[in-house]
């Protein structure tokens, strides 16, 4: 089979959409919508660039090089590329994404019943990760069965929630918090990092390409074309989900004005609109979705690291589950606070890598361009991260007042300047000399 039928392409698009939509993704648009008030759509535009546009572009970039993040990062060298891949796996694994699945389901399903309690979170997360561990050690056919059952149910629930957000808003749009009044677009842009979908796309891009190849497609041109179509289908789905959740959050000021995270906003709206039965349904759905996501990420991380470390798959599953359990006990709000500086630091070089991968043919040596620009973007990303963590008080004033620094995008101008300088040097040096055998 050399070409996919229409229904196969559509199925590929839905699969890509399902890969991106984890339970954690639905908690960020509501809180941004709530806090941005009348500036909600400007904040949404910034959010959609990093939470939808970049992941879709990343899928396309990976498809052009065969789906592997190692191939995409080849110009920066084997060790730097391996470090980048490891950081992506750790971020979408035990550092943030896996623990977040437990805290999201706890916030939505348990907190409304028992309230905030460290003991309750400890007991819940222990049971949660023991179950995730058991399934990850012996996935068998259980995960496939749950996945086939869960995917349409989750899409249906999101569709109902999205329609309800526009038909039955909880109230009028409230006032914006100061940071959104001053810079709604950039606040949305940086908050889009929290979905971690660009990092996730770097990890599972190979899954999408392999899914195309499994249908008998071998032509690189067709693989790239189908990956682009799948990415666009997923992108449209993500935009619809996010826009409806922004509207939900923006209209929830009357019922969730003091919410500290999106899970609280979401629960308040569902409780207000659908009552206790709807709230229980949402809690059960998100708990199941979170568990499936946790198992999938645990398996993926264990399979990746067992090929690179002298540890067995089973040992790594146990280590990953145990570490995720410990991190999850920070709680959702604290976990998000910790993740913001880290993601602020590592996102810029990933953005640079993906964006410049489309321009490789313009230079004599991609290494001369990518390595310096990524290094500069990382350095200034770390600067933004330190400021986001509240550690920038002692910085020189010129560092605090770089172009776009107030918007958390201090890395952008230096990266563009480095790109221009390196492009000029590359043009002057010409093609690298071939090493004689």
From Swiss-Prot:
Transmembrane residue ranges: 9-29, 40-60, 79-99, 120-140, 155-175, 189-209, 226-246, 277-297, 316-336, 342-362, 369-389, 399-419
Location, primary (coarse class): membrane
Intracellular or extracellular location(s): Cell inner membrane
A biological process term (GO) from this entry: branched-chain amino acid transport
Keywords of this entry: Amino-acid transport, Cell inner membrane, Cell membrane, Membrane, Transmembrane, Transmembrane helix, Transport
GO molecular function list: L-isoleucine transmembrane transporter activity; L-leucine transmembrane transporter activity; L-valine transmembrane transporter activity
GO cellular component, one term: plasma membrane
Signal peptide: none
NCBIfam families per UniProt: livcs
Family membership noted in the UniProt record: Belongs to the branched chain amino acid transporter family.
General function of this protein: Component of the LIV-III transport system for branched-chain amino acids. BraZ is specific for isoleucine and valine. The LIV-III transport system may be H(+)-coupled.
Protein name: Branched-chain amino acid transport system 3 carrier protein
Taxonomic placement: Bacteria, Pseudomonadati, Pseudomonadota, Gammaproteobacteria, Pseudomonadales
Name of encoding gene: braZ
């Amino acid at each position: 089979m050399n070409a996919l039928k229409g229904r196969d392409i559509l199925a590929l698009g839905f699969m890509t959409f399902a890969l991106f939509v984890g339970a954690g993704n639905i908690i960020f648009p509501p809180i941004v919508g709530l806090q941005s008030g009348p500036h909600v759509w400007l904040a949404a535009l910034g959010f959609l660039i990093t939470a939808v546009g970049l992941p879709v572009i990343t899928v396309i970039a990976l498809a052009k090089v065969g789906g592997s993040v190692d191939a995409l990062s080849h110009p920066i060298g084997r060790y730097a590329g391996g470090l980048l891949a490891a950081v992506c796996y750790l971020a979408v694994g035990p550092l943030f994404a896996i623990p977040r699945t437990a805290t999201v389901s706890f916030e939505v399903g348990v907190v409304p019943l028992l309230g905030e309690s460290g003991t309750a979170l400890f007991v819940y997360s222990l049971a949660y990760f023991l179950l995730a561990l058991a399934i990850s050690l012996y996935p068998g056919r259980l995960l496939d069965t749950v996945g086939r059952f869960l995917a349409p149910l989750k899409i249906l629930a999101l569709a109902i929630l999205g329609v309800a957000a526009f038909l039955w808003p909880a109230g009028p749009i409230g006032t914006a918090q100061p940071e959104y009044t001053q810079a709604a677009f950039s606040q949305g842009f940086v908050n889009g990092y929290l979905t971690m979908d660009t990092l996730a796309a770097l990890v599972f891009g190979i899954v999408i390409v392999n899914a195309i190849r499994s249908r008998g497609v071998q032509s690189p041109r067709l693989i790239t074309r189908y990956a682009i179509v799948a990415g666009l289908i997923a992108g449209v789905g993500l935009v619809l989900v996010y826009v409806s959740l922004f509207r939900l959050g923006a209209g929830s000021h009357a019922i969730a004005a003091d919410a500290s995270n999106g899970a609280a906003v979401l629960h308040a709206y569902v409780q207000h609109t659908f009552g206790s039965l709807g709230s229980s349904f949402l809690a059960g759905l998100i708990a199941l979705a979170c568990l499936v996501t946790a198992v999938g990420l645990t398996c993926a991380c264990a399979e990746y690291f067992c090929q690179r470390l002298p540890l067995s798959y089973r040992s790594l599953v146990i280590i990953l589950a145990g570490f995720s359990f410990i991190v999850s006990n920070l709680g959702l709000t604290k976990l998000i606070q910790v993740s913001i500086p880290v993601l602020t630091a590592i996102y810029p070089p990933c953005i640079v890598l993906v964006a410049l991968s489309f321009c490789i043919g313009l230079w004599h040596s991609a290494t001369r361009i990518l390595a310096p620009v990524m290094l500069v973007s990382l350095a200034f990303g770390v600067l933004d991260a330190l400021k986001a963590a509240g550690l920038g008080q002692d910085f020189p004033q010129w560092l605090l007042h770089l172009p776009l620094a107030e918007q958390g995008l201090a890395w952008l101008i230096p990266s563009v300047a480095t790109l221009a300088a390196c492009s000029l040097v590359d043009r002057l040096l010409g093609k690298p000399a071939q090493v004689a055998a």
